[in-house]
Amino acid sequence: MGFPPRCIGQKIPEGLHVRMNLETGVTEAKLISNDKPKNALKMIEDESNNFPEKTSSESENRKTSYKNYEELKKDFNELNLNPKTDAEILRELIEKHVDISKQKDRDEEEILTILEDLEFLVHQYDNANDFVKMDGFKTIVYHNLNATNSEIKRETLKLLGSSMQNNVNVKIHALETGSVDILLRILALDTDMSVKYRALFALSGLLRDFPYAQLKFVENAGLSVFSKLFESDNLKIQQKMLTLINDLLQEEIDSKKDTKQVEKIKQYEDIQLRKRLIVHNYCDHLNKMIVNSVVIEANDHDIIERCLGALYLMVDDCSSKLTDKSKDIVLSLRNLYRKLSQNESVDGDPDYFGTLYDLSNAIVQRIQKIKVEL
């Protein structure tokens, strides 16, 4: 279930929760109601035309029709117009989830609605912290990840991943309560690929910009789990893993640029991600992905870009293990993107193919240089 967009300039009623969708750039709004959870989403309508101008007689009537405070308070209570704080809504949703979960014939659709509402709320930094303080990880996240319903597990993993985005407090709590092992177990054992994909989303939220969690990931056989997934035929999951590994490698490179951050540099060095990747046959997996990106998804330049980016980051370590077919593909891609950069653009960006040409050309030149040095 998606979230309705809000047009700029529209009035925002009290109790309405608004966020910016970082994927689309659209401002979205959501009215969360515990009374009618299945109808929680509402379009915001422009209310400016719903109120006609008041006549002088109406103004006079208004002057003589004031109610005292107690009467107004009573009316507001009857209309349920007292807006609740996000913390109050969070607590009510958590309590409602606990109550439903105890029922023998629990309403799984209602649980999904609660998870969706919670996921919306935890995008806000303070709400995510409150979710942790209210024991949401134990009572909701970890409880649901033991469920048999794949849809509930998917939505719970989305909730988990969203709560950790750029929130170090939640990440620390997730790490201390065993999230790494739980997510790796799902990636290794769950048979539903859509659940695995969501588990990767949550794992990415935990590992990014958190070297201590990255260390726990590699120490707990995380790269072994990844290696098995690279051997599968699911290109979407492989692409997700590739993106995460690229980001983690780039983090390590960036950490060395600030020589004052001695402790941070040491943390990344302790991970030894590059060496561990080689041990877990990452170069072989790159070979396979480079070939598949062209053979299976020949027109998907985004996948090709990620594969080239991964190879660029590991070319010094993987050049000797690249097959002739992979090298020929990189050469062909360089020639292709040279031509495309001269003639075409993507989404109005004339530099897109030029960037891909520069990337593939840098890889070719580096491979040739390494060959000469040997």
Model-derived features with residue positions:
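Helix-rich alpha-solenoid scaffolding regions
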Residues: 132-185, 193
